[in-house]
Amino acid sequence: MKKLTLVLFGMLFLASSAHAARIKDVAKVAGVRSNQLVGYGLVTGLPGTGETTPFTDQTFNAMLQNFGIQLPPGTKPKTKNVAAVIVTAELPAFSKQGQEVDVTVSSIGSAKSLRGGTLLQTFLKGLDGQVYAVAQGNLVVSGFSAQGNDGSKLVGNNPNVGIISSGATVEQEIPTPFGRGDYITFNLIQSDFTTAQRLADAVNNFLGPQMASAVDATSVKVRAPREISQRVAFLSAIENIEFDPAEGSAKIIVNSRTGTIVVGKHVRLKAAAVTHGGMTVAIKENLNVSQPNAFSGGQTVVVPDSDIEVTEADGKMFKFEPGLTLDDLVRAVNEVGAAPSDLMAILQALKQAGAIEGQLIII
């Protein structure tokens, strides 16, 4: 049987943080982000692996007209060394004119391969329709494609996508709100009210009272210098402040394809019993009373005492010590050689019955 993999996180978001984290590792400055660019262009110089489509021919004719070449009316160039492509790039924050960025080139027609091609000058536009970069250069394609006369074909990786390292030159800068206003806002990568408040407290302890405040579960506003020249040093100091983020919420993440199970520290099970096929999983909870000695000053308290049993049709039984967690359940199911699908069904049934204290996420 395929074994189930259990992963207990002690340092990630599903469990408590064992070490302090820097602000720059858990939050981003609002407005300081990369921007996606896209353009439409032509790749030429292909060794017979191009295409002949209406939009490719139209683009090819428009390119010739830009160079002053006018084809006779009704002429349809049958070129197999040209391909229409979409060019994409990501423009980092604070990119300046003249800097270069990588581009990805993808065929949108029936071209067999872009290997050996050259991208002609292509304008890359942002969401607002303005041109922010211009791309051109020779493609690097890791894939390959070969076809025999009898129709047999061999393809490795993806020959219709290539990259051009430093293939686009930035022509226009994208403005950011970095230098505007009296405040700088930090947005948490993972929203959490407690983490937001702790971040604000850490900044106030470093800068002084009332310098930072949590707006909501995601954003923390920090009063910043008005002089732009001072904000770089200010942010450099702020983003390296260390603090203790809040413990993550109780979650169970199950990858049904690999059988991997990620269990948060705070996940607990209530009393329940599940029968799945020939396997039975039983959870029992007893409430014991702890009585202090006379005149000791102690208090009478109720102490939960939990046990779990897993049995199969052949009579196998597994017993566990009190103090039940989902870790015990997973190990018990693993002992009887259950497939990942068995545990998926058990976890879903327990969640539907309200026996799991936490979120169940199946990916």
Curated annotation (Swiss-Prot):
One Pfam short name: FlgI
Signal sequence range: 1-20
GO cellular component, one term: outer membrane-bounded periplasmic space
Keyword Chloroplast: no
Entries under InterPro entries matching the protein: Flag_FlgI (IPR001782)
Predominant subcellular localization, coarse grouping: periplasm
HAMAP family: FlgI (MF_00416)
Function: Assembles around the rod to form the L-ring and probably protects the motor/basal body from shearing forces during rotation.
Subunit and interaction comment: The basal body constitutes a major portion of the flagellar organelle and consists of four rings (L,P,S, and M) mounted on a central rod.
The name this protein goes by in its record: Flagellar P-ring protein
Record gene name: flgI
